[in-house]
Amino acid sequence: MALKSKLVSLLFLIATLSSTFAASFSDSDSDSDLLNELVSLRSTSESGVIHLDDHGISKFLTSASTPRPYSLLVFFDATQLHSKNELRLQELRREFGIVSASFLANNNGSEGTKLFFCEIEFSKSQSSFQLFGVNALPHIRLVSPSISNLRDESGQMDQSDYSRLAESMAEFVEQRTKLKVGPIQRPPLLSKPQIGIIVALIVIATPFIIKRVLKGETILHDTRLWLSGAIFIYFFSVAGTMHNIIRKMPMFLQDRNDPNKLVFFYQGSGMQLGAEGFAVGFLYTVVGLLLAFVTNVLVRVKNITAQRLIMLLALFISFWAVKKVVYLDNWKTGYGIHPYWPSSWR
């Protein structure tokens, strides 16, 4: 009886060990299958970024047992928000693809299968957005092998982590995953065929260009070009165009009280709209052109009466333009500009 009991215990132990080993091999095979499928999906993308949907998130994250043999860096995108330039979604997605391609090019061995770059599009994967708890874009998150709760925001990339675009993203990846991204490999601005065509055109056009330069018949010899260029630069400089470009200021705003009304002038010294800058630039340009006309053209008019009338008209228009600029400055800043007349005039 004792022998029979020992035999039963031995058989039970063998069965337990067999099932354990079978489960272990099964998990190993499952992980290997997931890795192979991720590698296959990555190979179909030019930049190595895998397009995932709700089914892919379920397969590679929620249904896969932890710890997973890979990490996923996920870029959350929404095509309907691409028109909002302040979000910079298209630019960040392009830089994200550059980091992915650089990582893939610099890690051809086993290190290349430890991290995969993925993207999720809102219109096709709304459930995944809810699963991750993403309610604002841009959003980039690293899902490490041990993460089981996808709402864990410990792997979220801060705005400072993509301030320098691809370079900052690469630093984030290297810091969090301990993997080496390697040098960022940006695509050239021009392909080799394009460079060849440009060089051929330059070689063909060089003799004709030299001939026209020697004869003084190029566009650079036209004084009207330089005059137009000077006016163009003057207008955009006094209009504060560089300020608007650097700060990405809109041309106008929508009135909060009346959505059908547009605001072209913003009251406050800390902000200038594009239309407002162009209006001020136009007034300054009018004064500058009148001054140039008076000092270079009007002095050649032989009729004294005509000279005086045109001079008075130019002074009146200039005074009106400067008055409008001063009024706008007073309205925006609250600081008044008052004339000080000589005491003998009072």
Swiss-Prot record:
Residues 23-189, 247-277, 330-346 are lumenal. Keywords: Endoplasmic reticulum, Glycoprotein, Membrane, Signal, Transmembrane, Transmembrane helix. Residues 1-22 form the signal peptide. One of its GO terms (cellular component) is endoplasmic reticulum. Residues 211-225, 299-308 are cytoplasmic. Its main location: endoplasmic reticulum. It holds the Pfam family OST3_OST6. Component of the oligosaccharyltransferase (OST) complex. Subunit of the oligosaccharyl transferase (OST) complex that catalyzes the initial transfer of a defined glycan (Glc(3)Man(9)GlcNAc(2) in eukaryotes) from the lipid carrier dolichol-pyrophosphate to an asparagine residue within an Asn-X-Ser/Thr consensus motif in nascent polypeptide chains, the first step in protein N-glycosylation. N-glycosylation occurs cotranslationally and the complex associates with the Sec61 complex at the channel-forming translocon complex that mediates protein translocation across the endoplasmic reticulum (ER). All subunits are required for a maximal enzyme activity. This is Probable dolichyl-diphosphooligosaccharide--protein glycosyltransferase subunit 3B.
